[in-house]
């Protein structure tokens, strides 16, 4: 992993919280309705901290971008990477074609349904656009099932139109199955919560992965930000 740009650390938090506490709790936290010092988050940080203390994350990840974080995978020093399908092409070009696979983020509590992360990119018309009529036609064109499939294939993503043909890429096929069978979808920490909250929260997550023994101080600091932003 490379956490220099923070959002990759948030992916770990999201998945762990979704697996431990479920979607409703997670979104309540994203909406600012739940404290970051809530005891239900203790297990999330316990599991995460245990991984960090045992050295399961590469060293110096806070100084690496997610792109630079691919190097340990390519040179054989790392075995797994929590990352979107868009990384597959890079790994294959680096010599791992036929040598990598995919598995769903593990279940932690069998009583909690499997919610997944599936951030969705969207295209919009600016409110002050001069030619909205043609812009709407272009959006309609982009939304067509066949066009969605073309765009998704180039980007290494899944199409958002459920009428689009099934993807041919083996990893996208598995991803499509996982998302289709999930209880529901979260977008991602920095999309699901207030932008300022996300920035401060992700800074805390990155610090926690480096210094898990600072958990209490980090959560207290993040909680202070939550109270200021959401006034709850």
Language-model region placement:
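Beta->alpha turn/N-cap motifs
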Residues: 66, 83-88, 119-121
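Conserved C-terminal helix/tail region of periplasmic/extracytoplasmic solute-binding proteins
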Residues: 180-232
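Glycine-centered hinge/linker elements that transmit conformational signals in sensory
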Residues: 31-61
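Extracytoplasmic/periplasmic substrate-recognition and gating elements
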Residues: 54, 93-156, 203
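Short, solvent-exposed loop/beta-turn-alpha elements that line the ligand-binding surface or hinge
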Residues: 20-43, 93-94, 107-115, 166, ...
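Short helix-initiation/N-cap motifs at beta->coil->alpha
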Residues: 60-74
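Alpha-to-beta junction loops
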Residues: 75-83, 98
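Extracytoplasmic/periplasmic solute-binding protein
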Residues: 1-33, 49, 78
């Amino acid at each position: 992993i490379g956490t220099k740009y923070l959002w990759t650390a948030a992916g770990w938090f999201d998945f762990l919280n979704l697996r431990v506490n479920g979607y409703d709790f997670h979104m309540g936290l994203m909406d600012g309705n739940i404290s970051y010092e809530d005891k239900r988050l203790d297990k999330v940080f316990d599991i995460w901290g245990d991984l960090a203390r045992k050295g399961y994350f590469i060293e110096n990840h806070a100084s690496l971008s997610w792109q630079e974080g691919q190097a340990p995978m390519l040179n054989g020093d790392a075995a797994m990477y929590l990352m979107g399908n868009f990384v597959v092409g890079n790994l294959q070009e680096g010599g791992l074609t036929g040598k990598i696979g995919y598995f769903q983020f593990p279940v932690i509590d069998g009583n909690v349904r499997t919610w997944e992360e599936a951030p969705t990119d969207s295209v919009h018309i600016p409110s002050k656009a001069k030619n909205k009529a043609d812009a709407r036609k272009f959006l309609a064109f982009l939304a067509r099932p066949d066009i969605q499939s073309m765009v998704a294939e180039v980007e290494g993503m899944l199409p958002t139109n459920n009428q689009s043909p099934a993807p041919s890429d083996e990893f996208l096929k598995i991803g499509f199955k996982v998302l289709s069978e999930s209880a529901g979808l979260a977008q991602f920490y920095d999309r699901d919560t207030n932008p300022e909250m996300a920035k401060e929260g992700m800074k805390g997550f990155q610090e926690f992965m480096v210094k898990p023994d600072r958990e209490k101080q980090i959560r207290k600091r993040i909680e202070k930000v939550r109270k200021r932003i959401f006034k709850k």
